[in-house]
Structure formats: C-alpha cells, structure tokens
Amino acid sequence: MPLVRLQVRNVYGLGQKELHTKVDREDPKAILDDVAVSGLVGILRQLGDLTEFAAEIFHGIQEEVMITASRSNKLKMRLKQIEAKVPTIQKTVLAQTNHIHFAYTGGLEWHPRIPNVQNHFMYDELPPFIMTPYEDCREPPRLHLLDKFDINGPGSCLKRYSDPTHFKRASRASKPSEIKKKKSIQRGRDISRLASVANQSDRKTCTSLSFSGRTSTSKTASTIEIESKSDLQEHRSFSFDSRSGGEKPKRVSSSSRFTPGSRTIASVLSESESESDSPSQDLTARGSSSVSWHEKAEIVECNVLQCATDEAPEVMETNFVLDAEPVSRLKEHSAVEAVQDIKPKELEMDNEDETESEGDDFVDALYTIDSESENDEAFQATKEVQKNLYNDITEQETEKISNNFSVDETKCAATSELHLSSSPVYKSDELIHQDPWAASEISSGTHSYSNGFSNPLYDISGIQEHQESEEVESSCDTESIKTWTNGNLLGLKPSKPKIIAETIPEIVEDIDSETFQEHLREDYKAPFDWFTSSPPLDHMKISFKSSETLPSSELQLKLPDEYTFSSFQLVPETIATSLPDSDSDKDTFCRSSSYISDNSDNDNRSVSMSEQQWEEESEGIRESKRQQELYDSFHRVNAEASSLPVPFPKIETTNGCLVENVSYLQNPAEPLPPPLPPLQWMVSKIPSAGFEDNNKQSLKDALTQAFEKNNNSLTAVKKKEPHIVTVSDPKLVTKVHLKNNVRDYKQSHGNTNETEAGDFLHQIRTKQFNLRRVVRTKTSSSETTMNTNISVILEKANSIRQAVASDDGEGESDTWSDSDT
C-alpha cells in the first residue's frame, strides 16, 4: 500500500483575518485576543483536514478488511465441502492396492504447453494500487469520429496513425535530405582547401598512389599547360588506368595533389551544381562537365575488368608531362569511353551510399580535367593493342593447359601399361610366367640347372642336378633385392614375411630378365639361357617355426666372401601340378636364399629359416605320404655323371648334430620301384636339423639295440651286391667340423652319419618310447670327407631297400639289425 503525504497549512493562515483586522490598534489586549481566536480557528481547520485524510485511509483499510473477510469466508465454505467429500474418497483410496493411477500429471502436461493468455491475473484479484493507474489512464483518442470526414471509409483515421508502413515511408524520405546536407558541407570544405592549395605553387607532383599495396607511376602536371589546353578546349578527363598501376585499385590515397588554379575551383563548383540537379545528366553530356569521384571509381573498375586476364606487371616509374606524351591522351580516351558504359542507376546508388571519410571525398577534383573532344584514331589503336595483348595471353594459357594435359595423359597411359604387363596371371592350377623366370626344381641345399636348353617347360630330360656354392660377388654399397622367392638365386635377399600356414603371398617380380642374365653370365659363368624358377606354389603349404625353439637346427655356412645363407624347405602337396618340371609330387624342394650377416665371427649361429612341414588334411593322405616318404628316403642321392664340379662350402655345426640335405631327381625312365615294406615298418619322416644331447644319447642307444637284436635279418640281404652311386669329384673339398659330442659318436659307431642319427634314429624313437640312456665317452675323431658320408648313407639305404624287397611277406622278423655294418 503506497504512503500518501498530506501538507498541513499554517494555523494562522487557516484563520479568518477579519477577526483581528477590525480591532483597534491602540488597544493591545484586544489585538492579542483577536489573534488567539484566529489561531484557534486555524487549529480546528487542521484537525478537520486530518480527520478527512484519516477517514480516507481508514476507509480503504476497512475495504481491504472486508475483502479479506469475504475471501476467508469463501475458504471456509470450500473447506467444509472438502471435509464432506474426503471420507468417500478416503474409502476408495484405501480400498486400492496400487495407487499409481492417482498420481497428478496435470502440471506435467501444462508446463510444456503454457496457454497463451493475455493476463495471468484475474481482474477481481488485482490489488487497488495496481488498478488505480489503470483507472486514472485516459482512453485512446476517439479517432473513429473523424472517419466520416475521410474518403477511405471507416477505420482509415485510426490506421493512419497506427500503420507502421507510414512511418517507414517517412523515415525513407528523410534520408536523402540528410545526405544532401552532408554533401554540401563537405563540398564547401573541399573548395576552401583546393583554393588554398592552388595558391601555394604552380606545379605539383602526384606521388604515392597505392594500388592494392603497389606503388603506381608518379606523374607531374603543370598548371600553365593545363590552362593553355583549357583555352584550346582540348582538356580531357584524366584518370589513372589500371594497366599502368598493374592491379585493380581498391582504395586510392594521395599525399599531395595538383590543382589547375581557378580552373579546378570552377570545375568543382560546376560539379556540385550539376550533381545536385540531375546525377544522370553527367553521363549523357560528355565533355560538358567534369567526372565525379564516384564515376572515377566506376571507370577504374571497368578498365580493370577489360584486362582481368593480364598478369600483374612490375611497378613502372615514369615522369612525363601531359602535353609531351601522347600515351596519356590514349589513356584519357579509354577512361572517357568507359564513362559512357556506366549505368545511371549504379551512379545513383553510389551517390546515396557516399562515405563520410574525408580522404575519399578529398580526391573529388583530383586528376580531373574537363574534356570536350576525342582523338578517335588513337583510341582505336589503344583498343587494338589491348585486344592483341589479351589474345596473346589467352593463347599462352591455352598452350600451357594443353601441354600439362598431354603430359598427364602420357603418364597415366604409361602407368596403366606397366600394371598390365607386370601383373602375373594365374589360371586354375597353371602358372603363367610373363618373364624369363620359368619354374624350376627346388632341392635341399642345391640348384637345378638345365645344360643347354632355353625353355624348361618343353625339355625335361635335359634337367640335371648340381650342387651350387659359387662365390657371390657383392659390395657394401649394393644391397640385395628384398623379394620373397624360392628360386635358385643366391643374390636375392628374403624379406622374411610373416606367412600363415596354407597361405602364400603372390609376388610380382619386377627384375629385368636380360640384365640379370648378363650379370649372372659375367659373374657366375652359368651355362644356361633361361633361369628356372620354382614350381607353382598353388598347392604348397608353408609353416614357419621360430629358430629359437630349435637352436640345434641353425647351420652356419661359411663362404669365402663372408656371406651366410639361410635354408628353407618346401614340400608340395600330393595333388599333381600342371608343370612338366615336377616329375614327382613327393619330391622335397629346398632353396637357399642369401642373407647378409653383419659379423659372423662374433656369433657362430647364423640366422636360418625354420623348417616347414606339410599339414595333412586326412588320415589316408598321411598314410600314403608316409609310404612314399619311406621309399624316397632310400633314394636320397642319385648323382649324375654330368654334374657340374661345384665346390661345397664348409659346414660347422652349432649343437653337435648335422643334417645334410642331398638333392636327388627321380628319373622317369627308371623301372618301377620294388614293393613297399609292410605298414608296421612305416614311420613318419620328420626332418630336423638337430636335437638335445640327451635325445641324441637315447637315439644312439636305440639304434645299437635295434641292430644287435636283429643281426640275422639282414645277413641274407648283405649277400646281394647293392647298387651304390658315389659322388666322386676331385674338386669337391668338404670339411666337417664337429663338436665333442659328435666326435664321440663318430668314433664309437664308425662311419654312421649324423643324418642317419637325425633321420632314422628319430623315426625309431617315435615308435619306441622306453629307451635307456647310454653313457658317452669323450674321444677325438678325425675329419672325414663328404664322399664317405654319402657313400655310407647310400649303402645303408640300399641294403634296407633290398632287404625289404627280398622279404616279400616270407614271415621274417619285422626288425632291423646293424650287425653287417
């Protein structure tokens, strides 16, 4: 409730003056009595005013109290109604087991969808201090009474004063007047400045015109020359052409300006008059009036558009006088010609959007000279020069684009041809070679060459086996090509990819065959025309084992040039391949790949590739595999008389067990082999490079027991002379260095080979698990040649083969003996 102050008047002012004015002034007692009476009257009046004010206040309070009492009475009535309804509702609520349906959801539905009402308070509920201003407000003007005097009909007068479009039109109409006022003020300021500058000197230099950061040409003009030209009516509208500056001028600024004296002032005055009258008339009346600054900006933009394809030239600096250089006239002609192409609407918009910057308006009369005549021939010459320049630049750009396109097209064509010619094609089981690297035999530790044939796919009988350990000539600068291959090249370095079992990555060899053949003929002196590559790897499965798990399988091959080769073994599946090079599906292919060791003296172990084994898919395949492997083990070496004399490198074992992979090639012209031995004799051949010392002791013990137990089984076999093929070559020099455990074994068992211990003994061990250990004695053994070792292996293999052939189901013992050895 607002507080209201009441101003109480003076007591004596409220009293009546007649009471003390009519008293005799000479009687003071009468005067005092009259004043006292008038004061009492004033007090009474003050009390009356206060009473009235209090009555108003208490009346409002009384009304508020009455309203509050009525509302309280209403609340009491509602409470009584609620009390009457609650018992019935309480019974229904208590009877319910689930009360979730009684949840209040009205507020959740109301708040997202607030009703758009005008007043949130009811009229009766507003307090009096809010309602009082509404009551005191006057009603809107009764404009509808004037509609009878308006021709637009009823409601037109109220719309006239409440329509927003009316105010928009009024504000739009007031803007041009404000712009005109600004123009007049700025022009008056420019005229005063131009007058002062014109009186300072007769000649001024125009410098430091900035076109987008570049300095334009500096030009000087003489007021005397300009005045003489004005007398001859040959003065022209001079403007800077964009080609002289080099780029499109975005903003023009000048530090000093030249003025032709009173002539410039007159031109400015005429400009202001003509511009205020009709801006569009300046375009039609060419030569009659000067060009404004807005027109000058349009001139520069039009000229820049004509030479937009020109490259930005370097800044040119020249000093010339207007009457001495005809080039300036040509530029003036082009500028005046461009003025005609400007639309009046564009100029009008520029005039309305004129900026308030003094720097821009200060250049209104700068470099502007009235022109009345034109030199048509010079102007046409300028247009021809511009056209020729544009054509030359266009031809140059087109020529550059065509050259780039032809180069790119040639590159794309060469790339596509390269991909088409270098990609190998595989069709079913056939391997189509697009390079002279044909399929070749892979043997353990050797390379198969053909003596005097060009294509191994059509000549089979000429294939011969040779052991190769030729010295590889290399240097520190050249690094061997990192291509994964199982071919017969010692110069290729394996990249050692991580190969999963039953998967072989396809390799595209990009080596030039002719260059490689010439290199091999010069360095290795190999008598062949085409290199024979490996057989197709479509059905080959390669599985790698870490060299750390089998430390005894590491071999260190020492060559004269300190190169170490790691060997790996590939075994084809039983499925026949389509190439004629593979005469037998059960052949064992081995290949040596070059691997450069950093320091072979510090470490006796060379990095070798782990052995790879076939994973048989069924038990029947395994049985047939074992039978053929047992037969193949009896034909390890079939040396030909025409073998090349190749020196064999020294082999030093690291863990005391040496396994030699001797190459062989089965001759299809030979007769069929004898019948296979019984299945009880069949053992799975597991190629291994070496075992632990304890395993070797067990194997030696088992071999000794087997040969002593079955001494009589091979007595009849020994009577027949076996067919032994001995590889004898005077150039073959092989030195085998064995450690103590190998030496003890060789001295105790004579010429029994380490390959036999690693191959046959392991086979026996897989069938007999209860073997006793044999204590070894350390003895020294002498060096033996490789020829003796191979002869012993062949003799033992042929003896067992003939024994098996002579058995032929006669019920002999199924054991072997070592009595004849």
Swiss-Prot record:
InterPro entries with a match to the protein in the record: SCAR/WAVE_fam (IPR028288)
Annotated tissue distribution: Expressed in expanding cotyledons, expanding leaves and expanding siliques containing developing embryos. Detected in unopened flower buds and in the expanding tip region of roots. Reduced expression in mature leaves and mature cotyledons.
Subunit structure, as described in the record: Binds BRK1 and actin. Interacts with SPK1, ABI1 and ABI2.
Taxonomic source organism: Arabidopsis thaliana
Keyword set includes Cytoplasm: yes
Protein name stated in the entry: Protein SCAR1
Positions with biased composition (Polar residues): 206-225, 252-265
Gene name in the database record: SCAR1
Region (Disordered): 168-189, 205-289, 577-625, 802-821
